[in-house]
Design a protein with these regions (language model features):
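Residue-level signature of catalytic and energy-coupling elements of molecular machines
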Residues: 61, 131, 226
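Mid-length scaffold segments of soluble, non-membrane domains
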Residues: 98-169
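A cross-kingdom marker for long, charged
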Residues: 27-32, 200, 207-243
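Metal- and O2-centered redox machinery and metal/ROS homeostasis
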Residues: 39-42, 47, 51-54, 114, ...
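Boundary of Sec targeting at the N-terminus
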Residues: 20-22
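N-terminal Sec/ER secretory leader and immediately downstream segment
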Residues: 24-105
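An amphipathic alpha-helical core segment
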Residues: 165-206, 211
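Sec-dependent N-terminal signal peptides
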Residues: 4-15
């Protein structure tokens, strides 16, 4: 690919110049003319490249999150005790019940890892529905513009799909039992403010938030790091080199 194409794509992706506010996809495509005997980069190529970028991102993100300890040993997305129950955990540790708190925390993350296995089809559906308008918005956007597109189009479906998985895993791993015991023990302490946060809703949303964080990381890699562009169309659209 000639260096002119690379430069133009780089400018689109970086979106660092004020003039990009006047970005016109048609004009960009007109400037993609290649030497005789070669083809132009079409709107379809750009959309295809973006869809592949998102697919790579969600595949890597989902795989990372759904493996054993994908949540539990990743401090970026590890699910901890709900904020409303932090005092519960702290108090129980002081009472020598830290192991129960640890078991509960592990169960939360196991539930997230199980739920993450269900995410890819939902993300793929959103990606295949992407329009040229969506693609232009993503190209002009920030480093996490594609991730924000997925947040807008998948959050509710993910929640509806994840909730029963989280519910089932929490029950299977006795997290609900641990949690109930923790809260009950705490609430029986004289003069403390009683707590009982919605554990299942909390764990479900934190699972979704964790996935988006991982996908945002993958998106940034693809935008910034040529090595992360694993297919020819990604190399073309995201301008890996002057080839």
């Amino acid at each position: 690919m000639n260096r002119k194409i690379t430069l133009i794509i780089f400018l689109i992706i970086s979106s660092s110049c004020a003039s990009m506010a006047q970005f016109n996809l048609g004009k960009v495509l007109d400037s993609f003319k290649k030497p005789e005997g070669s083809t132009s980069l079409s709107e379809g190529d750009i959309v295809k490249g973006l869809k592949e970028a998102l697919t790579v991102g969600i595949s890597n993100g989902s795989a990372e999150a759904s493996k054993k300890d994908g949540f539990f040993k990743n401090e970026l997305i590890k699910i901890v005790v709900p904020p409303e129950a932090q005092k519960v955990a702290e108090t129980l540790r002081k009472l020598g019940l830290g192991k129960e708190v640890d078991k509960f925390t592990l169960s939360l993350n196991r539930a997230a890892e199980d739920a993450a296995k269900k995410s890819k089809p939902i993300f793929v559906k959103a990606i295949t529905s992407m329009t040229i308008t969506d693609a232009v918005g993503i190209l002009k956007g920030e480093d996490d513009a594609a991730t924000k597109y997925l947040q807008k189009t998948t959050n509710q479906d993910l929640y509806n799909t994840f909730f029963p998985v989280v519910d089932s895993t929490l029950n299977l791993n006795k997290a609900t039992q641990y949690y109930g015991s923790m809260v009950k023990t705490y609430n029986e302490i004289p003069l403390v403010k009683k707590v009982n946060p919605d554990l299942k809703a909390y764990a479900t949303q934190k699972t979704i938030d964790g996935l988006y964080l991982l996908i945002a990381q993958e998106e940034k890699k693809i935008r910034k790091d040529p090595v992360a562009r694993v297919s020819s169309i990604l190399k073309t659209v995201f301008g890996q080199s002057g080839k």
